[in-house]
């Protein structure tokens, strides 16, 4: 797959594309771009490994059902996440045509 073709296709579909050499650079970029906002998380090992919940929750209101407070309501938390200003998830796949593929059991991607 040619990354430049993917970039062009995503841009044509209205996405802003940024790429990074390392996962740490990507996490730092998101941490500087999202500030003072509500942020919802879809269940994602990738986001966990990037440490984004810890980074963003220091200066945003973050909703993640993987970080459910004691006695919290997972369904209510997912609803809050879905209506956040920013919603972060990881895609299952992407086509060179710019189509993003998400398959999810809970429908939160």
Regions found by a protein language model. Give the residues of each.
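The feature marks the mature, well-folded catalytic cores of soluble enzymes
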Residues: 1-109
């Amino acid at each position: 797959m040619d990354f430049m073709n993917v970039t062009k296709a995503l841009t044509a579909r209205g996405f802003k594309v940024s790429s990074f050499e390392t996962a740490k650079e990507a996490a730092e970029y998101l941490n500087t771009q999202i500030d003072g906002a509500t942020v919802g998380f879809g269940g994602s090992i990738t986001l966990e490994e990037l440490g984004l919940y810890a980074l963003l929750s220091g200066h945003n209101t973050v909703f993640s059902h993987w970080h459910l407070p004691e006695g919290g309501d997972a369904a209510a938390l997912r609803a809050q996440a879905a209506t956040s200003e920013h919603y972060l998830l990881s895609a299952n796949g992407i086509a060179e045509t710019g189509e993003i593929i998400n398959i999810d059991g809970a429908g939160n991607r």
